[in-house]
Design a protein with these regions (language model features):
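C-terminal catalytic/acceptor-binding lobe
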Residues: 2-34, 42-46, 60-65, 191, ...
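Active-site beta-to-alpha loop of glycosyltransferases that engages the nucleotide-sugar donor
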Residues: 53-63, 84
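Short, acidic, metal-binding catalytic loop of nucleotide-sugar glycosyltransferases
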Residues: 67-76
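Short internal beta-strands
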Residues: 79-82
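Active-site-proximal specificity loops/subdomain of glycosyltransferases
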Residues: 84-121
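Conserved catalytic core of nucleotide-sugar-dependent glycosyltransferases
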Residues: 118, 134-208
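Short aromatic/hydrophobic "clamp" motif used to bind/position activated sugar donors
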Residues: 126
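Catalytic metal- and UDP-sugar-binding loop of GT-A-like glycosyltransferases, i.e.
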Residues: 129
């Protein structure tokens, strides 16, 4: 791993955590990563998945994420998009692999742009992973295997349920096999879902050139409606969250108006399309 990545991981803690909490997380992370890097994975699957990672405020996670994805047998290529023009992402990487595609964006990009990247690569299956979430290759394969068995919906490991009684979302639905209304942070989907995503984007008028296209508040919601049935999250065992996933200087969900925007969008999406349970 690049030295600068490990130094930043040690020195950059979440504003919500104390230093002792941060050091305990580091110990858990390194134990988990060692096991994930060494585990054996069944390779009797086709390599037909395009995986995409966006990096903006957490470049120290890039090498670990790329390594985990390249060790996942289903993954044909990994596209790493550096969405922060102030960062030279190659300074944070030592991996050299023909399956790794690195894109340095000329301007800062938002989350919806990853779907534009996906559209450039003809592939039956796609995997989007946020840069604050670590899953082992076997866990990624579990989700991709579920997608292969059921292509009617988007698959993931964490999501949200909408509660009509309170007109709000229940968050952090994870560690169980269950349908959700919105899947978050990791998304396994098909080329058909990608086309439907852009159809819904057009209906919402959220496409390139709109104000919403440059906001990172909504693409997970629209993608969740791109199937015919509700998204499904899976029980895959212990995975690791980066503590900076809740850091107010980075995390989009900490922005003012985030939740109100998403509730309003959920109502618009349910008016446009109903999903089977």
């Amino acid at each position: 791993m690049p030295l600068r990545s490990e130094v930043r991981r040690w020195m950059r803690k979440s504003h919500d955590d104390s230093w002792p909490e941060h050091f305990r997380w580091l110990a858990r992370f390194y134990r988990w990563r060692r096991r994930a890097f060494l585990e054996g994975v069944d390779r009797a699957v086709p390599a037909d998945v395009t995986a995409i990672i966006l990096v903006y405020g957490r470049p120290q996670n890039a090498e670990t994420l790329v390594h985990l994805l390249l060790r996942t047998p289903s993954v044909q290529r990994v596209v790493l998009s550096n969405n922060n023009r102030l960062i030279h992402i190659r300074d944070w990487l030592t991996i050299q692999d023909p399956r790794l595609v690195i894109i340095d964006q000329p301007v800062d990009r938002s989350c919806p742009y990853r779907h534009e990247i996906a559209r450039r690569y003809e592939s039956p299956f796609y995997l989007l992973v946020d840069d604050d979430l670590f899953l082992a290759p076997s866990q990624l394969e579990w989700v991709l295997g579920a997608l292969r068995k059921d292509t009617s919906r988007v698959h993931g490991v964490q999501g949200q349920l909408f509660d009509p009684g309170t007109d709000a979302f229940l968050h952090n639905i994870r560690n169980r096999e269950t349908p959700v209304d919105v899947v978050n942070r990791l998304y396994a989907f098909t080329r058909v879902h990608l086309r439907e995503f852009f159809r819904l984007v057009d209906l919402l008028r959220f496409g390139p050139g709109s104000r919403e296209w440059y906001q990172s508040m909504w693409d997970d919601m629209v993608l969740s409606f791109s199937g015919n049935t509700r998204p499904l999250v899976h029980e895959v065992g212990t995975f690791i969250d980066c503590p900076l996933s809740s850091d107010p200087t980075i995390a989009v969900w900490r922005q003012q108006g985030f939740f109100d925007f998403r509730v309003s969008l959920f109502h618009r999406l349910t008016a446009l399309k109903s999903l089977s349970p």
